[in-house]
């Protein structure tokens, strides 16, 4: 046979070799068709196997959505992204993935949307992300511990009378423009010292601020305030502003809880501020009505209570026993090898009332879900009392056990003293003849109110709060003019810092108020009160002398 002839066995080998590496690639997916779309929702036909909360993609429009309604012959989907891009007849595909957000440490200091995409122009969020589902079951009873560790807000009125513990849910409620966001930002700023070495302020607290339906300018202001005060580096801001699609406003609080749970389940403490849940409820009402769910009271859907309860129940103090913590119900697979016990998630939800009506539908719902409320009142705010906390209507149902012993000792009568002052103040307006004991109560009440006044961005360490409240409760400010109380407080605390730093450090470290510390507070407060009282007498003498000269 000549060299140019074809050998069948060689041809067979070549074909076998070539065809052996050949693989067929067929993409299999379940597709459906958009029946109608608009206002942030789409109704799809053909996705009969879709699951609740599953992500659906619209490949031609590069838009994603989440399944919210499962009906007999169609599926209701809420749309994330460019909601106007989806129209009737478009193709939609199942992804098989539940709506999730990728979380890692590099999110701290960033502003993101509820799907984890950066909004601050600082580039992508680097590093490997742990993908966690937006919806997740709350930890069961056996995976929780009692709330016993304080979360210091740095706000005297709260830490002394309405204490918040790590793992608690404390509602901040009030009309618009009463300082609700200021309470949240001050609390976040006060956690800065937990990240500084050598401050003995407890374990670091990682913060998440969730803005729902806020103006973009408001969110930008919060970001600037946190950055200016050195608190942004331990905070994640989740922004679903009023200009964003309604579905993103609905899922934003779940995304915030998700990020907080990442820190909680890895053995750390986290704080999530929801500002505010009233707007989330409005967003959910809008979506429910568009999806033709039957409306109930105030046109909210029947499961509006469950919306907030399942969100806020995710706040918890997790059991310290690591072996038990790893068995936690609903734990995502992505966290399985990272779980550590002893973490906590504290929630500070905000509800905006209309004309002070706390008996409306959403306020009463959230009050019944949370472990207490901080009620901010318009009249107090307008009269110059900041923060404008109405002590009579505010309560902390579990935080008391988390309050440090030193604060319990000095502030045990503070709430009742203020309540009696408010009552007497109302009666005193009707008559001028008051007996000495009533006048003395009014005088002290005025000074207590003044002591609890506090400028924004000026959190007070708990040991200094103990010192100044001790002086006020024990009558050392009774003879100090009300106008001089602020100066007295500054000088008093400055003197303690300079001359008795060891006493303040001891209170911070031991959380106890010793007899020696009380003696120091008594001595310093009495000396300064005498000076201020003498100054007042001299001023009165000068006024009398001037009047005599004029006569």
Curated annotation (Swiss-Prot):
Pfam families recorded: ATP-synt_ab (PF00006), ATP-synt_ab_C (PF00306), ATP-synt_ab_N (PF02874)
PROSITE patterns named among the record's database cross-references: ATPASE_ALPHA_BETA (PS00152)
Domain of life: Bacteria
Classification via CDD domains: ATP-synt_F1_alpha_C, ATP-synt_F1_alpha_N, F1-ATPase_alpha_CD
Record carries keyword Nucleotide-binding: yes
Record-listed E.C. numbers: 7.1.2.2
Binding residue positions for ATP: 174-181
Chief localisation class: membrane
GO CC field: plasma membrane; proton-transporting ATP synthase complex
Keywords, ordered alphabetically: ATP synthesis, ATP-binding, Cell inner membrane, Cell membrane, CF(1), Hydrogen ion transport, Ion transport, Membrane, Nucleotide-binding, Translocase, Transport
Enzyme class, broadest EC rank: translocase
HAMAP family assigned: ATP_synth_alpha_bact
NCBIfam families assigned: atpA, PRK13343.1
Subunit structure, as described in the record: F-type ATPases have 2 components, CF(1) - the catalytic core - and CF(0) - the membrane proton channel. CF(1) has five subunits: alpha(3), beta(3), gamma(1), delta(1), epsilon(1). CF(0) has three main subunits: a(1), b(2) and c(9-12). The alpha and beta chains form an alternating ring which encloses part of the gamma chain. CF(1) is attached to CF(0) by a central stalk formed by the gamma and epsilon chains, while a peripheral stalk is formed by the delta and b chains.
Task performed by this protein: Produces ATP from ADP in the presence of a proton gradient across the membrane. The alpha chain is a regulatory subunit.
Name of the molecule in the record: ATP synthase subunit alpha
């Amino acid at each position: 046979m000549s060299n140019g002839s074809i050998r069948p066995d060689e041809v067979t080998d070549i074909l076998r070799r070539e065809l052996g590496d050949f693989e067929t690639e067929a993409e299999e997916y379940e597709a459906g068709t958009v029946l109608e779309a608009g206002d942030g929702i789409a109704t799809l036909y053909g996705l009969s196997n879709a699951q609740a909360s599953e992500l659906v993609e619209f490949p031609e429009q590069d838009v994603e959505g989440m399944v919210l309604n499962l009906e007999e012959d169609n599926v209701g989907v809420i749309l994330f992204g460019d909601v106007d891009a989806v129209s009737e007849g478009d193709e939609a595909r199942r992804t098989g993935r539940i709506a999730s957000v990728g979380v890692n440490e590099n999110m701290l200091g960033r502003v993101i949307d509820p799907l984890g995409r950066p909004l601050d122009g600082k580039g992508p969020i680097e590093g490997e992300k742990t993908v966690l589902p937006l919806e997740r079951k709350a930890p069961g009873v056996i995976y929780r511990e009692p709330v016993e560790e304080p979360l210091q807000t740095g706000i005297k009125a709260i830490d002394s009378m309405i204490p918040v513990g790590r793992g608690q849910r404390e509602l901040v409620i009030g009309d618009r423009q009463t300082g609700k966001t200021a309470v949240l930002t001050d609390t976040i700023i006060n956690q800065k010292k937990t990240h500084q070495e050598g401050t003995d302020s407890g374990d670091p607290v990682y913060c998440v601020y969730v803005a729902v339906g806020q103006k973009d300018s408001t969110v930008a202001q919060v970001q600037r305030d946190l950055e200016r005060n050195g608190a942004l580096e331990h905070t994640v801001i989740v922004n679903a502003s009023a200009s964003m699609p309604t579905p993103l406003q609905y899922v934003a609080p779940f995304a915030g809880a998700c990020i907080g749970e990442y820190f909680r389940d890895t053995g750390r403490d986290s704080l999530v501020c929801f500002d505010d849940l009233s707007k989330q409820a409005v967003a959910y009402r809008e979506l429910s009505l568009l999806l033709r769910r039957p409306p109930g009271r105030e046109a909210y859907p029947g499961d509006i209570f469950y919306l907030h309860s399942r969100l806020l129940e995710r706040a918890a103090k997790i059991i310290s026993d690591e072996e038990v913590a790893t068995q936690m119900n609903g734990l995502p697979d992505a966290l399985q090898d990272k779980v550590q016990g002893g973490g906590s998630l504290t929630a500070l939800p905000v509800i905006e009332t209309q004309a002070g009506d706390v008996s409306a539908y959403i306020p009463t719902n959230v009050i019944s879900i949370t472990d207490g409320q901080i009620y901010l009142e318009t009249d107090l705010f307008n009269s110059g009392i900041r923060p404008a906390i109405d002590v009579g209507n505010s309560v902390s149902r579990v935080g008391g056990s988390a309050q440090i012993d030193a604060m319990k000792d000095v502030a045990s009568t503070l709430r009742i003293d203020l309540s009696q002052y408010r009552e007497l103040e109302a009666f005193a307006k009707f008559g001028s003849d008051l007996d000495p004991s009533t006048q003395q109560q009014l005088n002290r009440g005025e000074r207590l109110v003044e002591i609890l006044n506090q400028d924004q961005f000026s959190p007070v360490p708990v040991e200094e709060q103990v010192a100044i409240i001790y002086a006020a409760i024990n009558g050392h400010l009774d003879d100090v003019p009300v106008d001089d109380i602020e100066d007295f407080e500054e000088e008093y605390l400055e003197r303690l810092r300079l001359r008795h730093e060891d006493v303040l450090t001891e209170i911070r470290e031991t959380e106890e108020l010793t007899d020696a510390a009380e003696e120091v507070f008594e001595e310093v407060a009495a000396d300064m009160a005498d000076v201020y009282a003498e100054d007042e007498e001299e001023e009165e003498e000068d006024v009398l002398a001037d009047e005599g000269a004029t006569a």
